[in-house]
């Protein structure tokens, strides 16, 4: 069964979530600062989401009343990143399909093995904010569509029989979040002797920033990049030493993700190449045990490409001689001089006990030697045995 991937235009990476406060008319942020979309009246909104105009990203939209969103610069940058990731994902799927098709063509009887998928995020199909939030990185759990992902967070390991519980998945997701800092508990009690610039934990000025579930605050990434222009930002602005800590954590996560992606690609390529190759052994092809006949020795390299100075290889001659000996041994048979005949008549026994001198190749046989009877003699002289 051939595996093929049909290129389908996917608009999910162009989808943005519409600001609910903007729909109510209460959003205080302009469209150039809000992390959600502020569509115009001509835009088509479905289920609180809007599709961005692809021509607008390329700067070539000439429609007067375009039904697609023309995103502001900060959302346009995020959409371009999502588009590149989507293109890389499609290329990986096409490459994987070609490898599976080639392996299946070389081994028709072998079933296609499923590719292990690793998912460390909740279901994108049920979490709209995670699926369409432009400030969250485009997390690609695997090559599986979002509609068939599990509804509960789950880590799928290489062994499908051993799933990781949701608590471990949440812990892994927490470790991957590099935009959060733990709040100093001593600062919350008013007992922290270290200042804001010396403490390794966050000292937020506003208690509404603190997430009560894990006692953390979300860091303003725009402030770290030096471009936060909000008068009253709801995210934490960390001091210099905590900014360095966040940048180091982001660097480690990116390096680990790149190393894991390279290792996965190398393992897939190596497994595909290994499955298409096998060592050529003459003893395996002839059905002869390895101990009986040694493998064919390698031919020494020639001095010239035309083979004019080829040297006689004694290994080839020994190999051919061993094959000839094996064929001679298979065509010969051994028979006792006096066959055991149960319940035979005297005439039959006398016919069976023929003199050994009448047997070909046994004229010089002594009483202690077993005569060798050829296969042609066995076919021409039939011995009758009664059971």
Swiss-Prot record:
Keyword annotations: Cytoplasm, Metal-binding, Nucleus, Phosphoprotein, Repeat, Zinc, Zinc-finger
State the GO CC annotations.
cytoplasm; cytoplasmic stress granule; nucleoplasm; nucleus
Q: Which residues carry this modification: Phosphothreonine?
A: 6
Recorded superkingdom: Eukaryota
Name the GO terms of the biological process aspect: alternative mRNA splicing, via spliceosome; embryonic limb morphogenesis; in utero embryonic development; mRNA splice site recognition; myoblast differentiation; nervous system development; regulation of alternative mRNA splicing, via spliceosome; regulation of RNA splicing
Where are the bilayer-spanning segments? Answer: none
Which Pfam families does the annotation name? zf-CCCH (PF00642), zf-CCCH_10 (PF22628), zf-CCCH_2 (PF14608)
Entries under InterPro entries matching the protein: Znf-CCCH_Muscleblind-like (IPR054429), Znf_CCCH (IPR000571)
C3H1-type zinc finger span: 13-41, 47-73, 178-206, 214-240
Q: Name one GO molecular function term.
A: zinc ion binding
Compartments it resides in: Nucleus; Cytoplasm; Cytoplasmic granule
- UniProt KW Zinc-finger keyword: yes
Q: What does this protein do?
A: Mediates pre-mRNA alternative splicing regulation. Acts either as activator or repressor of splicing on specific pre-mRNA targets. Inhibits cardiac troponin-T (TNNT2) pre-mRNA exon inclusion but induces insulin receptor (IR) pre-mRNA exon inclusion in muscle. Antagonizes the alternative splicing activity pattern of CELF proteins. Regulates the TNNT2 exon 5 skipping through competition with U2AF2. Inhibits the formation of the spliceosome A complex on intron 4 of TNNT2 pre-mRNA. Binds to the stem-loop structure within the polypyrimidine tract of TNNT2 intron 4 during spliceosome assembly.
Entry's family note:
Belongs to the muscleblind family.
| Subunit structure, interactors included | Interacts with DDX1 and YBX1. Interacts with HNRNPH1; the interaction in RNA-independent. Interacts with RBPMS; the interaction allows cooperative assembly of RNA-bound stable cell-specific alternative splicing regulatory complexes.
* Protein name, as recorded: Muscleblind-like protein 1
The species is Rattus norvegicus
């Amino acid at each position: 069964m051939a595996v093929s991937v049909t290129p389908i235009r996917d608009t999910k990476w162009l989808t943005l979530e519409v600001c609910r406060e903007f729909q109510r008319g209460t959003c205080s942020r302009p469209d150039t600062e809000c992390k959600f979309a502020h569509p115009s009246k001509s835009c088509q909104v479905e289920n609180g989401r809007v599709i961005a105009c692809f021509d607008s990203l390329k700067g070539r939209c000439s429609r007067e009343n375009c039904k697609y969103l023309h995103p502001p610069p900060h959302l346009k940058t995020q959409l371009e990143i999502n588009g590149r990731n989507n293109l890389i994902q499609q290329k990986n799927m096409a490459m994987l399909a070609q490898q599976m098709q080639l392996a299946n063509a070389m081994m028709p009887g072998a079933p296609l093995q499923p590719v292990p998928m690793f998912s460390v995020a909740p279901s994108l199909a049920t979490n709209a904010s995670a699926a369409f939030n432009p400030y969250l990185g485009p997390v690609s759990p695997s090559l599986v569509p979002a509609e068939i992902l599990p509804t509960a967070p789950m880590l799928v390991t290489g062994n499908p029989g051993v799933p990781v519980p949701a608590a471990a998945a949440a812990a892994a997701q927490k470790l991957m979040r590099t935009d959060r800092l733990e709040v100093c508990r001593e600062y919350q009690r008013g007992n922290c002797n270290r200042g804001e610039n010396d403490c390794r934990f966050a000292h937020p000025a506003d208690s509404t920033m603190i997430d009560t579930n894990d006692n953390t605050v979300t860091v303003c990434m725009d402030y770290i990049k030096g471009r936060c222009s909000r008068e009253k930002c709801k995210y934490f602005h960390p001091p210099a030493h905590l900014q360095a800590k966040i940048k180091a954590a982001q660097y480690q996560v990116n390096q680990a993700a790149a190393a894991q992606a390279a290792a996965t690609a190398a393992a897939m390529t190596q497994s595909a190449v290994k499955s298409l190759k096998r060592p050529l052994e003459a003893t395996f092809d002839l059905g002869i045990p390895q101990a009986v006949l040694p493998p064919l020795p390698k031919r020494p390299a020639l001095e010239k490409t035309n083979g004019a100075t080829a040297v006689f290889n004694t290994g080839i001659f020994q190999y051919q001689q061993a094959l000839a000996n094996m064929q001679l041994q298979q065509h010969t048979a051994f028979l006792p001089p006096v066959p055991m005949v149960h319940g035979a008549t005297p005439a039959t026994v006398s016919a069976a006990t023929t003199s050994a001198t009448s047997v070909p190749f046994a004229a010089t046989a002594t009483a202690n030697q077993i005569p060798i009877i050829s296969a042609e003699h066995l076919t021409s002289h039939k011995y009758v045995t009664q059971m």
